[in-house]
Amino acid sequence: MKKAWRAGRLANAIKVAGMPQRPRVTDILVLMVPPLLWAGNAVAGRMASGLISPMTLNLLRWCLAFCILLPIAGQVLRPGSLLWPQWRRFALLGLLGTSGYNALNYLALHTSTAINVTLVASSTPVWMLLMGRLFFGQAISPRQVLGAGLSIAGVLLVLTHGEWAMLQQLRLVKGDFYVLLASLGWAVYSWLLAHPTPESASLRQDWPRFLLAQVLFGLVWSSLFTTGEWVLTPAHVDWGWPLMAVLAYVAIGPSILAYGAFGAGIQRAGPHVAAHFTNLTPLFTALLSAFFLGERPHLFHGLAFVLIMAGIALSRED
């Protein structure tokens, strides 16, 4: 009886993961958590750019997240855990999601502007559709393409403050290509989350363990990247309270809480829907600036929110 119950639960998990349903209000609220927390990530990374090298920042971020998750999810590391038969898949998730994506973004912030980084990252819904079509057999509907366009338009509205002529002043630099590579990797990472193997689907029911498994392999990749950084470049760490505050924020908020919420959102709504929510990040950044810095919100912020939410609505499955 117990085995049958577990089998039914696993089958349901696989069905939910493989066939995303129309998102409910609770799913939408969950998917709004990651961009809200990630809104401060670019700011924190920019603040820390003079205090610590980008690869080192990423390594320390996930080291701290690992230490936080270990007491509550350490069972996944034991011999005989469902993690080890799936270690290759988790190694790929760790590379694309926890290690490579963030390392490339931090690296980009050393050579590019926050506007350029956000602009290139806003193309993620497009890459999500293309990766789903090329590698996971997902059809692309005209309304999904329209939804991606509206979502990107909403981001552009925030970045240009409603003055489209500002786009003519943008110049692509090396850091922008780092963000493009990160966005492509994030698209593959999201689809892998949506199409788990039976074993990883079972493990994903406990998201702290599922995330810790990714972080474990992400640390391996991050250690390799950081070693190369210290060997090949003049890497540095300027210890102090400002850096410690940045590390605490990026480890707890954008790492543990945001990744857990994003994974849960993908499981229910699918990668193509979840991708549009990431485009709320620049809008939330502007709203947080209004709250903490006293900067007044403007009409274009409201219009941008409408465009992004319209893109989300169009991206949903019928």
Model-derived segments and spans:
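Specific transmembrane alpha-helical segments of multi-pass solute transporters/efflux pumps
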Residues: L37, N41-A44, L70-A121, M131, ...
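Membrane-interface helix-cap regions at the ends of transmembrane helices
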Residues: M47, L51, A65-L83, A153-Q169, ...
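Hydrophobic alpha-helical transmembrane segments of multi-pass integral membrane proteins
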Residues: T26-V30, T56-P71, L92, G147-A153, ...
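C-terminal-most transmembrane helix of multi-pass membrane proteins
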Residues: W5, I14, M19-P20, L29, ...
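Hydrophobic/aromatic residues within transmembrane alpha-helices
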Residues: A48, L57, R61, A108, ...
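Hydrophobic transmembrane alpha-helices of multi-pass small-molecule transport proteins
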Residues: L69, A91, M131, I140-G162, ...
